[in-house]
Amino acid sequence: MMLIIGLGNPGKEYEHTRHNIGFIALENIAKQYETSFSVKKKFHCEIAESTNNGQKLIFVKPTTYMNLSGKSVIAVKTYYNIPLEKIFVIHDDIDLELGKIKFKTGGGNGGHNGLKSIDGIIGNNYHRIRIGVGRPQNSQDVADYVLNNFSKTEYVIAEQAIDKITDNFNLILENKLEEFKSKMV
């Protein structure tokens, strides 16, 4: 069993924001496993389930807003009894250039409030797929920046990163994590 979480904020107004690239990527990955999301209030999320080669896949989009993502993660993790090494979190990263991807296990939260929430509840020894959204170019507040929509040009670059993750996601399912990591460079 594997838990794949995309971080973002619920609501139409956030749908295409930089902070929601985790949701966007997760939806793209889930689509290839022919599943759809439904709201599960007891888990504080939208959830989709599928199987691949006998392995159950649970896709989760927390509906708690970014800063409380851990509430949803612990609810699903506990219900399904999923160990940390089978948890993958996809999220935006302002410290990475737009479209760059990094895969890592454990580590700090880099000031990301969604990760802070998760780390505070389950610890930090889970896998992260970090998708670069870049930093604001001027004196724009970081919170405003990540809560703004991508420009059309930026969205094309973001989609290319999402496609790269989706196209290679099978490597994660096959537990070829180092190979997945090398393909993200």
Curated annotation (Swiss-Prot):
GO terms for molecular function: peptidyl-tRNA hydrolase activity; tRNA binding. InterPro entries: Pept_tRNA_hydro, Pept_tRNA_hydro_CS, Pept_tRNA_hydro_sf. The record marks 92 as: Stabilizes the basic form of H active site to accept a proton. It is an enzyme of class 3 (hydrolase). The record marks 9 as: Discriminates between blocked and unblocked aminoacyl-tRNA. It comes from the Bacteria. TRNA binds at residues 14, 65, 67, 113. Its EC number is 3.1.1.29. The active site is at residue 19. One of its GO terms (cellular component) is cytoplasm. GO terms for biological process: protein quality control for misfolded or incompletely synthesized proteins; rescue of stalled ribosome. Keywords: Cytoplasm, Hydrolase, RNA-binding, tRNA-binding. Belongs to the PTH family. Hydrolyzes ribosome-free peptidyl-tRNAs (with 1 or more amino acids incorporated), which drop off the ribosome during protein synthesis, or as a result of ribosome stalling. Catalyzes the release of premature peptidyl moieties from peptidyl-tRNA molecules trapped in stalled 50S ribosomal subunits, and thus maintains levels of free tRNAs and 50S ribosomes. Monomer. PANTHER family: PEPTIDYL-TRNA HYDROLASE. This is Peptidyl-tRNA hydrolase. The gene is pth.
